[in-house]
């Protein structure tokens, strides 16, 4: 299974917001950090907002932020909003197949079991887990300046 670019950047946007703490994150800043167009991020933002995964604040000093702790937002929460279909084979799509084995096929059952296992793994990881796995994330995203070692004056 391959996740879409939309899902990839939705997760990245949420990671950026989580790394930025309670401060508002602006779409141009997020776009610059990831080297992607603002328009693409705005497109992704809409379903995330409708699902309650992102909160938007309008106005001159507006932006986006997480509406709840990053530890409460799972990867599954994001994937179920951003992916259109989880059909791993045509027999997953109702009315799309003429196969006489569709109701008793072992492949269908095996793929359904694999898909459920995939969802279970995604439910075990949060946005917070991804952020904490990268100790330098704030520096990498341009949210902080690198800490430079102080040299003593001789």
Swiss-Prot record:
One cellular component term from this protein's GO annotations in UniProt: cytosol
Required cofactor names: [2Fe-2S] cluster
Keyword field contains Metal-binding: yes
Record-linked InterPro entries: TR_Rrf2-type_CS, Tscrpt_reg_Rrf2, WH-like_DNA-bd_sf, WH_DNA-bd_sf
Keyword rRNA processing tagged: no
Domain spans labelled HTH rrf2-type: 2-132
Highest taxon of source: Bacteria
Any one Pfam family match given in the protein's UniProt record, by short name: Rrf2
Positions of [2Fe-2S] cluster binding: 91, 99, 105
Keywords, sorted A to Z: 2Fe-2S, DNA-binding, Iron, Iron-sulfur, Metal-binding
Cofactor binding mode and count: Binds 1 [2Fe-2S] cluster.
GO molecular function, one term: metal ion binding
SUPFAM superfamilies, alphabetized: Winged helix' DNA-binding domain (SSF46785)
Protein function: Required for growth utilizing PHB cycle intermediates.
Protein name: Protein aau3
Organism: Rhizobium meliloti (strain 1021)
Gene: aau3
